[in-house]
Amino acid sequence: LLMNGVPRPQNFDKDMKIDRNKPRGAADWEFLKKLRALWRGKLIIKGVLNPKDALKLERLGADAIYVSGHGSRQFDSCPIPIHQLAKIRSSLKKSTVLIYDTGIRNGEDILKALCSGADFVMVGKQALFSIAAEGFEGLVQMTNNLKKEIEIAMAQMGAFDINRLNAGHLESTLT
């Protein structure tokens, strides 16, 4: 971002207008089948909140499933993404890549997502706010803060390897 500026998707014309009041149901299952057949690159589908949809996407050949409520800014009544994450993970093959991004505010939120089955956790607003406030140094500080928060929370959880986190780490083992 700092080196090349804001990304500009090449498949959108700069004058393209989107009417947010019109239905956008053009990307149905048949469209995705055709897209997968035509597209040889990686296919990541974002906005998945239903385990049945995730399973269908896996069967259609999606390379990754991106669990996201889009910051919960577009549809307040959608299922809570972090509550759906473990359900989606359990419906998929272990080899299917699962990405998560909603509601990440600190290192503990990252750990919750990893324990719930995410392979990758994205941090959007935090990174943008950090860059806006302090430029590159803000991004470095944000990254260092998240790392420290993760280390502290893992110690509290009794977890020693971030690659071995699982749902059991979210439950207290003390009686």
Where are these regions (language model features)?
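Active-site entrance/lid segments in N-terminal catalytic domains of soluble metabolic enzymes
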Residues: 1-55, 59, 71-74, 83, ...
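Conserved functional loop/turn residues at catalytic and ligand-binding sites
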Residues: 61, 69, 117
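Conserved, mostly hydrophobic/aromatic
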Residues: 35, 57, 65, 113, ...
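Short, acidic/turn-prone active-site loops that include or flank metal/cofactor-
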Residues: 70-73, 126-128
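Residue-level recognition of oxygen-bearing side chains
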Residues: 53, 80, 109
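Alpha/beta catalytic cores of nucleotide-metabolism and tRNA/nucleoside-modifying enzymes
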Residues: 83-175
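Second-shell residues forming the walls of enzyme active-site clefts
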Residues: 64, 77-85
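Structural preference for beta-strand elements that scaffold enzyme active sites
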Residues: 42-44, 63-66, 97-99, 120-122
